[in-house]
């Protein structure tokens, strides 16, 4: 944290270029931020503090000095994260990835039209129309995607309420409330319960002060703050309070040591906003796909350009061919299909409580192979709950379920009544007003987490605590402090059969036991002998080992003769007994796991996803929760477990024998990257405890080095750098801090880890369905492009026009392609390993070979069959067509003879040609029926999957209706050059459609019968 600490170590050798310098500086700054928090203010004595900051420790700074510092350091505010200007976002949608390919297509069309317009007297307008339509497609889908993202980002308009509005400072001995942005380094600040800490403070005096650091360190318990230096690590010491955490109770004074971006919170926010998010896997896939399509298009275009020149076409004609082939290869409708598919999934996920901020993140979640999850609030319920009691020398289990449906215990025992009385009276937590109608567990409580847990437990078991406190009036109390480690209060006893005053005490179990000489067993006091002390010790160790926070409880009836009615109890100079008390029992609390989490973790495991817990909490608690939710599965041991079982020192155990592993933050700090890689590689079940935000980031980078796609979940500010660095960051909608929501790609509206698993399933499904959509869309490229190629090579009249191609890509194929996004998952979706982004591509060789090489070729054969049938019916036999093109297209020749010697004028010839375009188009529609049905599944038979997808059935009818409309609607001959066709011509394609269906069903059958065989390797996409 020190300004400029260790800068010199990082100075690179003279960097020549300005750009390199900038990059080097950015990397250096990031390294600087990734280092652990370095500050030494917590080690300084008050004198040294006074010397360092020039502050009078009782009167504060002078207003003049404060103004100077404010001018030097700037306001005490976080720099808002850099936002991308809206026009840049819009341009990204218009010119990114796939759109670029369509723009190139459009420009080439305009170019071709320009060439034709310059060289022909009456140029055809096909290319002009095509260029206009392509531009329109890009602009419309671009606007659509931009609108989607803008809608999501509106939900994210926060971060502003991170900064506290007012702060109480002491300047020149006067208390004044000022805007928190005007607080400067060296200011003397006072905070009380309920305030937000306005800057990083070094505490110089405190009274019962506790702060909630959960958003920074992930610890759910409020932390005591005092002037004492208690730990080398500034995040753990008691005498530093951090900017933007909350003071829960008590009061404190402190000197401001850092403000704004230099605070610990500021560094984390800067760290998060400075990280490069990187490209999403689906964006990389689409880029890879564009490379393939562009490669194929350019290769074919150039090959046929050269071929045309060899076949003695003019170079102008050759250029027109080149452009035609490239454009025919571009699947115009696919950009819209992909955008719509992702949007549909995002909407479906929002219904399941996952809000996706970035459309492409939908798929990323599906390819996730490692989830680094925060513990508090994500895996657990984020409410301390009483878990166990130890009284009458036995452990009782309490009900920790969210809906109180679990086990209960005997509530009539005299010891339990005494224990519940102490827990209710020696407790400062109270329910907030007007909540009588709410269930007890849902009520808001003023007080710390442990006391709230006790309050709710006693209210559930024994009725109103408020009434109990009214009956037993409180006379005096000594609040909990870190030196004594106990809390004590004395109450009037309404029960006349017992002494008038009851002293109750709770605190750290070993401290409480030391003050006791007897113990309550079945309502009777017994001397506390060694045997009972051992029983206590065993119970304490057992509950502590479960990761629970244990408190001890004792009481004492004060004898009436020494403490008569009206006795003045003095808590400063204590005039009542604090020893020889009667020990009543232990109560332990834990933040229990959420009910749905163990099942979700199990699903992750069967889907091949590794779940790693990363928490700021204590290792024992972390390990207990990890075992509770199945992150460490039953029977798997850590190195410590093996050492305990074999009764040998930990150092003698081979770490690789242990499948599970709990790593402490302090050990992680000293590890090299190689050691961390070793842990991540050789242990399947890992828990990182007591980690700092910087370490979370290092863990994520370690997982990414292993080639994992990492999802990070968390709700605190401490999770945001890791969340930003991960492939997908998941923030909590309810408990999440604004900084973490800012950095995330997805927000769980119900804060439940189980929703992530739903997300993973949806992500995998969308990847499968996108593959199916692409396979469907690409297949029709072959029957669209082969007519063009045969037209050039064999010199026959053009079988299919450019405008007709557009009618397929943007008309008949659109709805069916989108309908595949609604297809249900195949049975193996959550049983297979996560996809490997390096090898499992969205568009792979197998998909191209199936779409282009096999199904596409059958479709093209069907098209040509129809074409030759119709021309033969009109008198032109196939053999007669070869080499006919030059005369056919010459508008000055009006006596071209057919196979039977009839003469055809230019106009008549063109009508026959366009009449052929329409059946060729209809044939493609008919064979695409079969293609759509076979694309429903990749491995299962269509008969297994069924036809439950209503949108797909609608798609089949829609494409048929559209084809019929385009063929038979009056005026289409002029607009699109489509002519009505005889009903019999529809049936030419049926055998080919059936062939496609049978061929693919047989292929899938072989894949299922012979997994891993040749057919699967070559054709399973």
Curated annotation (Swiss-Prot):
This is Sodium/potassium-transporting ATPase subunit alpha-1. The modification Phosphoserine is found at residues 16, 38, 45, 226, 450, 482, 666, 673, 941. Residues 594-715 are annotated as: Mediates interaction with SCN7A. Its EC number is 7.2.2.13. The chain crosses the membrane at residues 86-106, 130-150, 287-306, 319-336, 771-790, 801-821, 842-864, 917-936, 950-968, 984-1004. Coiled coil: none annotated. The modification N6-succinyllysine is found at residue 659. It is a multi-pass membrane protein. Pfam families: Cation_ATPase, Cation_ATPase_C, Cation_ATPase_N, E1-E2_ATPase, Hydrolase. One of its GO terms (molecular function) is ATPase binding. The modification N6-acetyllysine is found at residues 9, 21. SMART domains: Cation_ATPase_N. The lineage of its organism: Eukaryota, Metazoa, Chordata, Craniata, Vertebrata. ATP binds at residue 485. Residues 1-37, 214-233 are annotated as: Disordered. GO terms for cellular component: axon; basolateral plasma membrane; melanosome; membrane; plasma membrane; sarcolemma; sodium:potassium-exchanging ATPase complex.
């Amino acid at each position: 944290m020190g300004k400029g600490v260790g800068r010199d170590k990082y100075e690179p050798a003279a960097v020549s270029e300005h750009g390199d310098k900038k990059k080097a500086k950015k990397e250096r700054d990031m390294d600087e931020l990734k280092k652990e928090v370095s500050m030494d203010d917590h080690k300084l004595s008050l004198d040294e503090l006074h010397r360092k900051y020039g502050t009078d420790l009782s009167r504060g700074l002078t207003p003049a000095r404060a103004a100077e510092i404010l001018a030097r350091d700037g306001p005490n505010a976080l720099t808002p994260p850099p936002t991308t200007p809206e026009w840049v976002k819009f341009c990204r949608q218009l010119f990114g990835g796939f759109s670029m390919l369509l723009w190139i297509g459009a420009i080439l069309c305009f170019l071709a039209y320009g060439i034709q317009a310059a060289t022909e007297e009456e140029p055809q307008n096909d290319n002009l129309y095509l260029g206009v339509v392509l531009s329109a497609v890009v602009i419309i889908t671009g606007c659509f995607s931009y609108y989607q993202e803008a809608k999501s980002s509106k939900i994210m308009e926060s971060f502003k309420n991170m900064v506290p509005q007012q702060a109480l400072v002491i300047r020149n001995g006067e208390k004044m409330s000022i805007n928190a942005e005007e607080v400067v380094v060296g200011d003397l600040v006072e905070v009380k319960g309920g305030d937000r800490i306005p800057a990083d403070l070094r505490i110089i005096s405190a009274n019962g002060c506790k702060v909630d650091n959960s958003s920074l360190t992930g610890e759910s318990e409020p932390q005591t703050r005092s002037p004492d230096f208690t730990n080398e690590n500034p995040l753990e010491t008691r005498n530093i309070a951090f900017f933007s955490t909350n003071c829960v109770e008590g009061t404190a004074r402190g000197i401001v040591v850092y403000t704004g971006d230099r605070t610990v919170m500021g560094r984390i926010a800067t760290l998060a906003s400075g990280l490069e998010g990187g490209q999403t896997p689906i964006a990389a896939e689409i880029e890879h796909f564009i490379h393939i399509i562009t490669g194929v298009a350019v290769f074919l275009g150039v090959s046929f350009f050269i071929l045309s020149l060899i076949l003695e076409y003019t170079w102008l004609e050759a250029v027109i061919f080149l452009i035609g082939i490239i454009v025919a290869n571009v699947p115009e409708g696919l950009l819209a299909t992909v955008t719509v598919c992702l949007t549909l999934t995002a909407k479906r996920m929002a219904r399941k409580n996952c809000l996706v901020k970035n459309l492409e993140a939908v798929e990323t979640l599906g390819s996730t192979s490692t989830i680094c999850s925060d513990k508090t609030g994500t895996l657990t319920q984020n409410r301390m709950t009483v878990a166990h009691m130890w009284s009458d020398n036995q452990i009782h289990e309490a009900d920790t379920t969210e809906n109180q449906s679990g086990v209960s215990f005997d509530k009539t025992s005299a010891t339990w009544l005494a224990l519940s009385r102490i827990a209710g009276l020696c407790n400062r937590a109270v329910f907030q007003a007007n909540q009588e109608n709410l269930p007890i567990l849902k009520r808001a409580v003023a007080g710390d987490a442990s006391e709230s847990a006790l309050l709710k437990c006693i209210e559930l078991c024994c009725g109103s605590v408020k009434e109990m406190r009214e009956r037993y009036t409180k006379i005096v109390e000594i609040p909990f402090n870190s030196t004594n480690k106990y809390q004590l209060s004395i109450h009037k006893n309404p029960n006349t059969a017992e002494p008038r005053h009851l002293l109750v005490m709770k605190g750290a179990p070993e401290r409480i036991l030391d003050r006791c000489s007897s113990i309550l067993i079945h309502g009777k006091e017994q001397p506390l002998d060694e045997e009972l002390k051992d029983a206590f010790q065993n119970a304490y160790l057992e509950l502590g080992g479960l990761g629970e926070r244990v408190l001890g409880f004792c009481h004492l009836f004060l004898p009436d003769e020494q403490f008569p009615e009206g006795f003045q109890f003095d808590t400063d100079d204590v005039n009542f007994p604090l020893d020889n008390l009667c020990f009543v029992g232990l109560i332990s609390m834990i933040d229990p796991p959420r009910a749905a989490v163990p099942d979700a973790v199990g699903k992750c495991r069967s889907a091949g996803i590794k779940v790693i817990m990363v928490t700021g909490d204590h290792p024992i608690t972390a390990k207990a929760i990890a075992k509770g939710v199945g992150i460490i599965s039953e029977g798997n041991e850590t190195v410590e477990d093996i050492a305990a079982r074999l009764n040998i020192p930990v150092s003698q155990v081979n770490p690789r024998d242990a499948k599970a592993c709990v790593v402490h933050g302090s050990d992680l700090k000293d590890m090299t990257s190689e050691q961390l890689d070793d842990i991540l590689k050789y242990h399947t079940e890992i828990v990182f405890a007591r980690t700092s935000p910087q370490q979370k980031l290092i863990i994520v980078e370690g997982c990414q080095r292993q080639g994992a796609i990492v999802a990070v979940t968390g709700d605190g500010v401490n999770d945001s750098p890791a969340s930003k660095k991960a492939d997908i960051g998941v923030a909590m909608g309810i408990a999440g801090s604004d900084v973490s929501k800012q950095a995330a790609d997805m927000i769980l509206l119900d804060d439940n880890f189980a929703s992530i698993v739903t997300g993973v399933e949806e992500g995998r499904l969308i990847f499968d369905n996108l593959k199916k959509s692409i396979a469907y869309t690409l297949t029709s490229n072959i029957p669209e492009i082969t007519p063009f190629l045969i037209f050039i090579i064999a010199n026959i009249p053009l079988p299919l026009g450019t405008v007709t191609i557009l009618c397929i890509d943007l008309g008949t194929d659109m709805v069916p392609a989108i309908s595949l996004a609604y297809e249900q998952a195949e049975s193996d979706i959550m049983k297979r390993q996560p996809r490997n982004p390096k090898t499992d591509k969205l568009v792979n060789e197998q998909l191209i070979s199936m779409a282009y090489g096999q199904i596409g070729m059958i479709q093209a054969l069907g098209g040509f069959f129809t074409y030759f049938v119709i021309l033969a019916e009109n008198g032109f036999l196939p053999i007669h067509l070869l080499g006919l093109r030059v005369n056919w297209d010459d508008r000055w020749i009006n006596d071209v003879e057919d196979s039977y010697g009839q003469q055809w004028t230019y106009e008549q010839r063109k009508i026959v040609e366009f009449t052929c375009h329409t059946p060729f188009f209809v044939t493609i529609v008919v064979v695409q029926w079969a293609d759509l049905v076979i694309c429903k599944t990749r491995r299962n038979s269509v008969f297994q999957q069924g036809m439950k997808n209503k949108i797909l059935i609608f798609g089949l009818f829609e494409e048929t209706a559209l084809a019929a409309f385009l063929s038979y609607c009056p005026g289409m001959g002029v607009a699109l050059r489509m002519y009505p066709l005889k009903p019999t011509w529809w049936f030419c394609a049926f055998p080919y459609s059936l062939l496609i269906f049978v061929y693919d069903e047989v292929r899938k059958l072989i894949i299922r019968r012979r997994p891993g065989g040749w057919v699967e390797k070559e054709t399973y996409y």
